[in-house]
């Protein structure tokens, strides 16, 4: 084959959509690319499988619905943005901290780590236990229940007077709710969104996280000059508004057609597909989509109810898929994003910024607008290319950030005044890092796991994968104060090494799923397609007569030629 590997040519992956199949088919068949050439069979298949509603407003309805569901990410982002400021606010320190001999208040490293990071443990447990509600009562009702649990946790936190462990318990309970949201929101979006926009719409979940972080920073900045509990109780009180908005939004969102088919509600599933695609319920396109979903559900039923063990022993390739989901979610945390977002205020103090709350807002702005860019890149360049290039970009940023912090920040030794130029350089490259993270790994980790698993094990697999994310979030959140106290900005080299590993892992283990239905992704795994050749894979119903499926399953070249050479 003469196709170029994903690393070299992001354009190849970006063209792998159902609307542009001739280009992909020609790569596999060793033929020149001719966009105007299709065989009659493929053209006929496309006519049925393609949404006939291609006007300017074709996806407005489903986009609005998915943004409402994605608002669950805002709830998590708000917590991340506010807690980073709480641990530096005077009233919070007075109520929940300890007293120095000079009369000032502080939070010990252990207490800081627990207050900040225990939320992640709650999220991990909630993701595993509460995600099952989506299978039992539907994705919408499951989301409403976990939001109510989140509200209970917020009430406990606001009611805390001076007992840090009461606040601690409240964060665990609110974490249970957010953990359920983190599984059910991307799941519902991926099952409702048309395949042409699934990557973009699932990425809206991450966009809402960044918006929550940014507005959380802004709220902390607005309340920091108060001398009483307004500093932290007002940001917490606003959580009620976000939760009620999400519950209200659920009344307008259609239920997952895949869940409805599984529950035997075929007419409701047809209506859901009709609503999100803006096509009449009796249109052949809706019937075709419904038949594909029904076939998938029937196949799952024939195999019986899924056990947890099936995540590692099931077919096709469930062990590989489960481990890939766990690794991608783990590596998203090991990018080091929460080093900046949880402890951004502390980091800015360390580099000599005069108003660390104000500078945190800069992070929030960069994060939000960079994530807006990801809504374009995720479906334009594909999942693999974004993850690969994102890892390279973050490695470069960490090299500069850590090196300047270690060698130039304190020219006269730590504690003897910092270099303003070095501090500014570190802030700039921290912003570059956030751009690389927010446009690639931040949203695409959720996109990948929402597309990877078949329906019968989806809630279990996604909950395990996101639990790995929360577990690493806890470890990073808890141990960061100790690690930075011991090795300071050498910490950046740790995350740099993780990103080097992430690059190689993605190249060899993560396939391209852009432009495929959830059922087609399952077929691709069943065929054993090599991840670095997966961008050239074509669904069975759309293959030409000369399609060489076997060529995508074998590669005898040395690894360096797989990665950098032409096939």
From Swiss-Prot:
Segment Disordered: which positions? 1-30
Q: Give the originating organism.
A: Saccharomyces cerevisiae (strain ATCC 204508 / S288c)
Where is this chain's protein located in or outside the cell?
Membrane
Any one GO CC term of the record: cell periphery
- List the induction conditions: Repressed at high glucose concentrations.
> What is the protein's known function?
Low-affinity glucose transporter.
Name by which UniProt lists this protein: Low-affinity glucose transporter HXT3
Query: Which protein family is named in the record?
Result: Belongs to the major facilitator superfamily. Sugar transporter (TC 2.A.1.1) family.
Matching SUPFAM superfamilies: MFS general substrate transporter
